[in-house]
Amino acid sequence: MAETAAAVYRRFLDLIGQDRWAELADYYAEDAVVEQPYARPEPGVIVGREALRERFAGREGLPLRLTPQDVVIHETTDPEVVVAEFDYEVTITTTGERFRTANVIVLRISDGLIRSSRDFHDVGRITEALSRR
């Protein structure tokens, strides 16, 4: 039996918590679309696994640790669609500053790959904390 969409996303979040950024792009379909309505300075859309790979590679040098907490994944009537609610415990490693941010993500996952996601993150708070590093 194929792995559920919820199980795939839980594994993905585990990698984030382990700072294994280089592996994350492998969870996306080649033509995946990621929408980030709260991205700044303007909403963002990232298209394709390789564009995501480049984006994640840029995270590796940041003094930032994200630990997913209180993860709840809601399955829907469509087995490919899940809604994930969770907090990140954010640590700025250079200053020791810690705080939590809320996140909601709507994902379509099939054949073990993320096809699309709409990510609602508090990027402003994280960006502000990184600017104080």
Regions found by a protein language model. Give the residues of each.
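Short beta-strand edge/turn micro-motifs at domain boundaries
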Residues: 81, 104-128
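Short, cysteine-centered beta-strand-loop-beta hairpins and adjacent loop/turn segments enriched
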Residues: 90-100
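A short hydrophobic beta-strand element
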Residues: 78-88
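Hydrophobic/aromatic beta-strand elements that line small-molecule binding cavities or substrate pockets
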Residues: 68-74, 88, 102-107
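A solvent-exposed, acidic/Ser-Thr-rich amphipathic alpha-helical stretch
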Residues: 27-77
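Short beta-strand segments enriched in hydrophobic/aromatic residues
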Residues: 28-29, 88-90, 105, 121
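Short, low-complexity N-terminal intrinsically disordered segments enriched in polar/charged residues
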Residues: 1-26, 30, 132-133
